[in-house]
């Protein structure tokens, strides 16, 4: 009998805001917003493969947080360790695209002077799991 998920994915769930080819995602339109963040992507991928997986992270009480909450539930990701933050927004990463399609991460958008929700992750006891994946932003 399993005591917890096989894998816990700890870290970021964010929006990748891709600007138009050759443009700046901070000012040029249209932009293409995609749900992203390596731990969130891995959690969804493992769940689709039938692996018991939990996501541990913190999102804002905003449209981005709501979209991830729905996605995790739809994909079968355990959200018991998902925290929501009423004061800080979810993170948006600005991604510049060259005309040839190459991507360059340019910075963040959405901070209102309080930082981002993922910076305020409250310590929690992780359930027993066989594997732990940690994203790069918490480091």
Residue locations for each model-derived region?
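Conserved N-terminal subdomain of the carbohydrate kinase-like
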Residues: 52-136
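Glycine-rich phosphate/adenosyl-contacting loop at the front of the ribokinase-like
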Residues: 1-77, 119
